[in-house]
UniProtKB/Swiss-Prot annotation:
Subunit structure, as described in the record: Interacts with the mTORC1 complex; this interaction mediates the recruitment of mTORC1 to the lysosome and its subsequent activation.
Organism of this sequence: Homo sapiens
Protein location: Lysosome membrane; Cell projection, Axon
TM segment ranges: 56-76, 82-102, 130-150, 178-198, 205-225, 239-259, 282-302, 319-339, 371-391, 395-415, 428-448
An example Gene Ontology CC term for this record: axon
Catalytic activity, as annotated: L-asparagine(in) + Na(+)(in) = L-asparagine(out) + Na(+)(out); L-glutamine(in) + Na(+)(in) = L-glutamine(out) + Na(+)(out)
Main location: membrane
InterPro entries named in the record: AA_transpt_TM (IPR013057)
GO BP terms, alphabetized: amino acid transmembrane transport; asparagine transport; glutamine transport; sodium ion transport
Protein name in the entry: Sodium-coupled neutral amino acid transporter 7
GO MF terms held by the record: L-asparagine transmembrane transporter activity; L-asparagine:sodium symporter activity; L-glutamine transmembrane transporter activity; L-glutamine:sodium symporter activity
Functional note: Symporter that selectively cotransports sodium ions and amino acids, such as L-glutamine and L-asparagine from the lysosome into the cytoplasm and may participates in mTORC1 activation. The transport activity requires an acidic lysosomal lumen.
Similarity comment: family membership: Belongs to the amino acid/polyamine transporter 2 family.
Length: 462
């Protein structure tokens, strides 16, 4: 039997576990975040042995479904129609599931409980730092997308309340920049400053209800469309093979639950790779059904004229859609602080490690540093959200990073784990797994490079 030796030189990867804000980074919003001592004792936390198989499926589905749902009809349009969109998602699903299984295997081998800790342990210091930077940038970009979504939905709701026609200019207090800023300062900033997050369970509930309600509305509106809604051109084939790849960021952003998955795996009553394979397969099939239902019906309802945020394509006066907009706003208001908390914890760990200051010796300045980090993060995301026109442009950038979490880092972990096995004669399965790891890294690097370059030179500079 192969012996696995996972980079056990702890001096090389000095981990930051607590900077006054213990965070199991990017875990599912259903999980309470608490200091380490509370984490291990809390009955509501993700303690090892407390989560059933069915519960794990729910948590993974919840972590997967989110704001990216609104962009899926536009992704089908970008990909070139229903057939291309379905084929792309089905092909991606194999790699998405395998990446989740690889992370569970490496977590078990390295005895680490979070995504970035697994990467640190298996791949070493440099890759670990790159992973943490990627998580920080990804959460930062997602926070920008959340603020844009708030503005999109508020515009439609305010238009109905003020009884203004579509596109008409209203009073200054209905201006998009003012309403986003007011909402952010009144609700998001106060929720982002605290050291701990105790409202994650409510965010989880709102997220689940909002996601399923949006999907139901999109499907119902396709089956029984309003008379005034006429679809644009219904594409049946992609304009080019590059057009198909331009839909990749949305799919990667939508299905990226890999960073959240490692704590969930370690929380299971039976944290076994085989059991986990069944969990993630079931969860991804459920998520696929939701994304496909929204993507197909939203695209067929509006065709090529669909907005990057599908809810913007519906009339402002539609009350059923207005309820969906309200759900999305409430969900985003509670989800932003959670994503910010995760990004802040990563930045904190990187900063303390760079300074060479042990966490225990720097607790005294934690509050001042936390408030400063929160204000800088909040103001930068707000400023960018005010001037970026739609979520499609943000997703096109951070979707490339999501590809790294799905493909690149799991692929590197698989390669390093297999290379660490001490066997004189390598069996065929060893070569197959190493080759598959190389394929994952290559494919992920290509998607990241292509989508990021396209986002910069086509979307952002257009």
């Amino acid at each position: 039997m192969a012996q696995v030796s996972i980079n056990n030189d702890y001096s090389e990867w000095d981990l930051s576990t607590d900077a006054g804000e213990r965070a199991r980074l990017l875990q599912s919003p259903c999980v309470d975040t608490a200091p380490k001592s509370e984490w291990e004792a809390s009955p509501g936390g993700l303690d090892r042995g407390t989560t059933s198989t069915l519960g794990a499926i729910f948590i993974v589905v919840n972590a997967c479904l989110g704001a990216g749902l609104l962009n899926f009809p536009a992704a089908f349009s970008t990909a070139g129609g229903v057939a291309a969109g379905i084929a792309l998602q089905m092909g991606m699903l194999v790699f998405i599931i395998s990446g989740l299984v690889i992370l569970a295997y490496c977590s078990q081998a390295s005895n680490e409980r979070t995504y970035q800790e697994v990467v640190w342990a298996v791949c070493g210091k440099l890759t670990g730092v790159l992973c943490e930077v990627a998580i920080a940038v990804y959460t930062f970009g997602t926070c920008i997308a959340f603020l844009i979504i708030i503005g999109d939905q508020q515009d439609k709701i305010i238009a109905v309340m003020a009884k203004e026609p579509e596109g008409a200019s209203g009073p200054w207090y209905t201006d998009r920049k003012f309403t986003i800023s007011l909402t952010a300062f009144l609700f998001i900033l106060p929720l982002s400053i605290p050291r701990e997050i105790g409202f994650q369970k409510y965010a989880s509930f709102l997220s689940v209800v909002g996601t399923w309600y949006v999907t139901a509305i999109v499907i119902i509106k396709y089956i029984w469309p309003d008379k005034e809604m006429t679809p644009g051109n219904i594409l049946t084939r992609p304009a080019s093979w590059m057009a198909v790849f331009n839909a990749m960021p949305t799919i990667c952003f939508g299905f990226q639950c890999h960073v959240s998955s490692v704590p969930v795996f370690n929380s299971m009553q039976q944290p076994e790779v085989k059991t986990w394979g069944g969990v993630v397969t079931a969860a991804m099939v459920i998520a696929l059904a939701v994304y496909m239902g929204t993507g197909i019906c939203g695209f067929l309802t509006f065709g090529a004229a669909v907005d990057p945020d599908v809810l913007l394509s519906y009339p402002s006066e539609d009350m059923a859609v207005a309820v969906a907009r309200a759900f999305i706003i409430l969900s985003v208001l509670t989800s932003y602080p959670i994503l910010h908390f995760c990004g802040r914890a990563v930045v904190e760990g990187l900063w303390l490690r760079y300074q060479g200051v042990p966490v225990e010796e720097d607790v005294g300045r934690e509050r001042r540093r936390r408030v400063l980090q929160t204000l800088v993060w909040f103001l930068l995301t707000l400023l960018l959200a005010l001037f970026i026109p739609d979520i499609g442009k943000v997703i096109s950038v951070i979707g490339g990073l999501a590809a790294c979490f799905i493909f690149v880092f799991p692929g590197l972990c698989l390669i390093q784990a297999k290379l660490s096995e001490m066997e004189e004669v390598k069996p065929a399965s060893w070569w197959v797994l190493v080759s598959y790891g190389v394929l994952l890294v290559t494919l992920g690097a290509f998607i990241f490079g292509q989508t990021t370059a396209n986002a910069i030179f086509v979307d952002l500079l257009a």
